[in-house]
Amino acid sequence: MASQGTKRSYEQMETDGERQNATEIRASVGKMIDGIGRFYIQMCTELKLSDYEGRLIQNSLTVERMVLSAFDERRNRYLEEHPSAGKDPKKTGGPIYKRVGGRWMRELVLYDKEEIRRIWRQANNGDDATRGLTHMMIWHSNLNDTTYQRTRALVRTGMDPRMCSLMQGSTLPRRSGAAGAAVKGIGTMVMELIRMIKRGINDRNFWRGENGRKTRIAYERMCNILKGKFQTAAQRAMMDQVRESRNPGNAEIEDLIFSARSALILRGSVAHKSCLPACVYGPAVSSGYDFEKEGYSLVGIDPFKLLQNSQVYSLIRPNENPAHKSQLVWMACHSAAFEDLRLLSFIRGTKVSPRGKLSTRGVQIASNENMDNMESSTLELRSRYWAIRTRSGGNTNQQRASAGQISVQPTFSVQRNLPFEKSTVMAAFTGNTEGRTSDMRAEIIRMMEGAKPEEVSFRGRGVFELSDEKATNPIVPSFDMSNEGSYFFGDNAEEYDN
């Protein structure tokens, strides 16, 4: 990517950005992981969880959600000001699952947010440790990306549901900072901007007054974040147009949707990080592993090694397939919801199937679900190889892809060609090239027309044996190109509902 030199690496975003060398970054990320681990150990003690119960991913999710809620300033303020019946704004909680008399029972716990904040700060040497909180948000976001297809949200903003490969991070809260912005897909940014513009169209005062000035600053910042993700001059110029508009309206929405479509072929740069559940970090810390001393990276071998040696369990509903549940969580752990399934199968060493073929619902259990027939099983989160996570979209080229998802967003920096359905994508670009962005549109369409199927992305990059910690011997995988490469293929995954 051309501008790589001017950007901060995401470890720097993760660490408040003073330019640090690799060792300092690894130590700093390690410190963040230590804090999450220590917090989780303490919460398991508070909740009186057995070792097995502490390694249950559903319990991990509840504990993570409690601390995120405890630190959600804006929502907490809102709840104080708009009290709703039966909800104590000062408390947070959720379902905790325990093994009682040979079966799983659900217990609803409630804690003071103040108490949770105290435990979190204590585990993080007195700091608020916002980076650790963001890390958990990204893990939840990656899990949502793998579990749900955002068809409805896409359609509501006037986008095509087949653009789901652009929607990474679409459920990340606004407060997720620079690290959160780095992992958001092109479609996610476009959707946030369209929502904003629509509010401006419907509400005369949206851009006016002191609040409007803040809104305008946020709008321009989001435009700049999106611009920074595009890799071609024409796409960036188009973002300048959208940003500089005096009174953003339908023309800007058109331009944004156009640029999102173009990203199916001219892919943007989106960061990928392996963020694991707290119940992985906790046991590692309690076994005496010192992440800060050893150093840790979210984009290298470390998360793979950690998962090789972790035991994580999950509740399984009566007609779910534990192997499928494992695949769902494995993909979430590596931020790989929109990666090519053929590459994922190669790295994982077992076949990775499209979402619609998986007999599993989401990981979280709803409060009205019956616990009587719940079983639990071990999640298989190990891998055959490891690969470096990418923050670039790779070169852009074409190959047969599917009806449901018509492009991929690469997660791993591994040589291959990136599939997309060129005829389908290009069909959306008939006609409309008039207006003030016509020259950019023409240029973008020309580049898309020129994208070639035989072009290889990430040339020379490969996967590595797990024993090859220094990444010295890349293994370039070979694929059966006739196979289906998209995860949300003609899909019936559940919708994500807030």
UniProtKB/Swiss-Prot annotation:
**How is this protein annotated for GO cellular component?**
helical viral capsid; host cell; host cell nucleus; ribonucleoprotein complex; viral nucleocapsid
Sample GO molecular function, one term: RNA binding
Q: How is it modified after translation?
A: Late in virus-infected cells, may be cleaved from a 56-kDa protein to a 53-kDa protein by a cellular caspase. This cleavage might be a marker for the onset of apoptosis in infected cells or have a specific function in virus host interaction.
**Region Disordered: which residues?**
1-21
Which residue intervals are annotated with compositional bias (Basic and acidic residues) in the record?
8-21
- Find motif (Unconventional nuclear localization signal) and give its ranges: 1-18
Could you provide one GO biological process annotation from this protein's UniProt record? viral penetration into host nucleus
Stated role: Encapsidates the negative strand viral RNA, protecting it from nucleases. The encapsidated genomic RNA is termed the ribonucleoprotein (RNP) and serves as template for transcription and replication. The RNP needs to be localized in the host nucleus to start an infectious cycle, but is too large to diffuse through the nuclear pore complex. NP comprises at least 2 nuclear localization signals that are responsible for the active RNP import into the nucleus through cellular importin alpha/beta pathway.
The family note in this entry says: Belongs to the influenza viruses nucleoprotein family.
What is the designated name of this protein?
Nucleoprotein
Gene that encodes the chain: NP
